[in-house]
A protein has these predicted regions:
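Bacterial N-terminal signal peptides that target proteins for export
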Residues: 1-9
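C-terminal segment of classical bacterial N-terminal signal peptides
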Residues: 14-21
Length: 138
């Protein structure tokens, strides 16, 4: 195989590999709502299944401010660090910044952690049980 053909084949392989990995990364929108009049405080969907590398987009839809805080009680040290590392602009341990206005978003790229269920909640609306769960698939 001459150099030009080999180079073209290598480039095609890189493009294909990039496309395959881009397809493997799923994006999921999780809306966050609070409505005092209707007594509705929720993440929609409240249960999300994802894999490492997937992108979770939390969007404040109504009733801001909102936040995303992961429960840390039963996390191993490595998992705790991985989740903290995935949460850019953290304002505290396992905690996103406040989404101050409706329409604002917060993104998390799911870190490589053990399969299982990870619970999260909205700190400003925790008393109203605004909570959800992230299920990490095998």
């Amino acid at each position: 195989m001459d150099r030009l053909a080999g180079s073209a084949l290598f480039t095609a392989m890189l493009v294909f590999a990039g496309a395959a990995s881009a397809e493997a990364q799923n994006k999921q929108l999780i809306q966050i709502e609070a409505d005092r009049e209707k007594d509705v405080y929720r993440f929609v969907p409240a249960k999300v299944t994802a894999r490492a590398g997937d992108v979770l987009i939390f969007k404040a839809v109504r009733g801001s401010p909102h936040s995303i805080v992961f429960e840390g009680r039963d996390l191993s040290e490595a998992t705790h660090e991985a989740i903290n590392g995935a949460m850019g602009r953290r304002t505290g341990d396992l905690s996103s910044p406040l989404l101050q206005t409706d329409g604002s978003e917060y993104r998390i790229v799911v870190p490589r952690v053990a399969p299982g269920v990870y619970h999260f909640y909205c700190l400003p609306h925790r008393a109203y049980e605004e909570q959800g769960e992230l299920r990490i698939a095998k």
